[in-house]
From Swiss-Prot:
It is an enzyme of class 4 (lyase). Involved in the catabolism of short chain fatty acids (SCFA) via the 2-methylcitrate cycle I (propionate degradation route). Catalyzes the dehydration of 2-methylcitrate (2-MC) to yield the cis isomer of 2-methyl-aconitate. It is also able to catalyze the dehydration of citrate at a lower rate, and the hydration of cis-aconitate. It has no aconitase-like activity and is unable to catalyze the hydration of 2-methyl-cis-aconitate. It catalyses: (2S,3S)-2-methylcitrate = 2-methyl-cis-aconitate + H2O; citrate = D-threo-isocitrate. It comes from Salmonella typhimurium (strain LT2 / SGSC1412 / ATCC 700720). This is 2-methylcitrate dehydratase. The lineage of its organism: Bacteria, Pseudomonadati, Pseudomonadota, Gammaproteobacteria, Enterobacterales. Disruption phenotype: Cells lacking this gene accumulate 2-methylcitrate during growth on propionate. PANTHER family: 2-METHYLCITRATE DEHYDRATASE, 2-METHYLCITRATE DEHYDRATASE-RELATED. Keywords: Lyase, Tricarboxylic acid cycle. One of its GO terms (molecular function) is 2 iron, 2 sulfur cluster binding.
């Protein structure tokens, strides 16, 4: 039997073509999308500024080789670094994701679409500084917002129906694909060059979820998105040189992504690319917690207040029952020792125990100093979770996109509180009116972590005036964030 393969170069896979046509041709007309992108930008930058408080993050920042000087390099907010766009994308992306406090998208695949801002902002700033140096017009922040909307859409629409987690792949592969497409367009590549760039992103071997799950949970989950968005910038720059692409990167028999990495299945799509994802993205506003636990933490805070009013403490608790959805059980229902902050912020029992004990949940609560309190593990042992199929159905319903959790607390004296149910977290599109004022407050708090009062005010004066922000050159806006 012949094993010869027919060596006829195919057309580009339809999935790749659709991404490229969208990023090149789609005109964003949604006011809601731009409104949301504005707040998303501020929130994402603020998350990065907070991460600078943590040495484990800061040690990864800066140039690859100390002392490297890049003329007209991209700024890294909250630092003095000015780097090549690839390394700047890694720096910004790692900062953004470090504390698990930036936005979230929940579907068949999970992810954090604002991770793409690493590549988008680094490239836009680098292009702007070089344009100004050459006497040309820089990019504006409106172009950054447009790029964010499109990157959100690419990552989120693919995620709606396609569970990369089911085959052990990490969602940052979608950051790489989305960032590659948007950055390539921003760089001014031709259609053929962008097709090549996106195909290169799919051909890459993709990150495994190993570092997100027991027994190997670790800090790579905090820099994996920075790695992906920086790789995207590199691939786009390679394509700009004329580097070839691989038309059937997805569909090639035996050697394509589908056969190698997706068990021979092909992607399914719920809707065409538009602006749906940015309009419906979830913000983490109140708690730096894995998003499937956000409503559980909110419920636990309510229960803490009820215990205070009743004169009870966590020491009086006999049992805690969490009624939840399937994705929560699969990702963050965790028993046994928790070895590091990355372990703890992906354990629903930990994230519920802390507010029941202390009436709070902050990024510092995942650190060893707090985690060594033996009362936390003792309370974790009393917390049990089970799936409510109705919560799971509402989680997958595109018209609801609920992330429901309900908690019941029983006490050693035989009494119990009524179940506290929270279906939509405060960062959900259905609670924007509640959430946006708190999001702005979160941004102000994060600015205050790094900048003196007058500099904070200069940043706020521009950032909270969207019309002024949109017209501002990218390089001038990022100059506001230099320490």
């Amino acid at each position: 039997m012949s094993t010869q393969e027919l060596n006829i170069r195919p057309d580009f896979d339809r999935e790749i073509v659709d991404i490229v046509d969208y990023v090149m041709n789609y005109e964003i007309t949604s006011k809601v999308a731009y409104d949301t992108a504005h707040y998303c930008l501020l929130d994402t930058l603020g998350c990065g500024l907070e991460a600078l408080e943590y040495p484990a993050c800061k040690k990864l920042l800066g140039p690859i080789v100390p002392g490297t000087v890049v003329p007209n390099g991209a700024r890294v907010p909250g630092t003095q670094f000015q780097l090549d766009p690839v390394q700047a994308a890694f720096n910004i992306g790692a900062m953004i994701r470090w504390l698990d406090f930036n936005d979230t998208w929940l579907a068949a695949e999970w992810g954090h679409p604002s991770d793409n801002l690493g590549g988008i902002l680094a490239t836009a700033d680098w292009l702007s500084r070089n344009a100004v140096a050459a006497g040309k017009a820089p990019l504006t922040m409106k172009q950054v917002l447009s790029g964010m909307i499109k990157a959100h859409e690419i990552q989120g629409c693919i995620a709606l129906e396609n569970a990369f987690n089911r085959v052990g792949l990490d969602h940052v592969l979608l950051v790489k694909v989305a960032s590659t497409a948007v950055v390539a367009e921003m760089l001014g590549l031709t259609r053929d060059e962008i097709l090549n760039a996106v195909s290169l992103a799919w051909v890459d071997g993709q990150s495994l979820r190993t570092y997100r799950h027991a027994p190997n949970t670790g800090t790579r989950k905090s820099w994996a998105a920075g790695d992906a968005t920086s790789r995207a910038v590199r691939l786009a720059l390679m394509a700009k040189t004329g580097e070839m692409g691989y038309p059937s990167a997805l569909t090639a028999k035996t050697w394509g992504f589908y056969d190698v990495s997706f068990k021979g299945e092909t992607f399914r799509f719920q809707r065409p690319y538009g602006s749906y994802v940015m309009e419906n993205v979830l913000f983490k506003i109140s708690f730096p917690a894995e998003f499937h636990s956000q409503t559980a933490v909110e419920a636990a805070m309510t229960l803490y207040e009820q215990m205070q009013a009743a004169g009870k403490t966590a020491a009086d608790i006999e049992k805690v029952t969490i009624r939840t959805h399937e994705a929560c059980l699969r990702i963050i229902d965790k028993k046994g020792p928790l070895n590091n902050p990355a372990d703890r912020d992906h354990c629903i029992q930990y994230m519920v125990a802390v507010p029941l004990l202390f009436g709070r949940l902050t990024a510092a609560d995942y650190e060893d100093e707090v985690a060594q309190d033996k009362r936390i593990d003792a309370l974790r042992e009393k917390i049990v979770c089970y799936e409510d199929p109705a919560f799971t159905a509402d989680y997958h319903d595109p018209e609801k996109r609920a992330i429901g959790n309900a908690i019941t607390v029983e006490f050693t004296d035989g009494s119990r509180f009524g179940e506290v149910v929270v279906e939509y977290p405060i960062g959900h599109a259905r609670r924007r009116a509640d959430g946006i004022p708190k999001l702005i407050e979160k941004f102000k708090i994060n600015l205050a972590r790094q900048f003196p009062t007058r500099q904070q005010q200069r940043i706020l004066d521009v950032s909270l005036d969207r019309a002024r922000l949109e017209q501002m050159p990218v390089n001038e806006y990022l100059d506001l964030y230099v320490i």
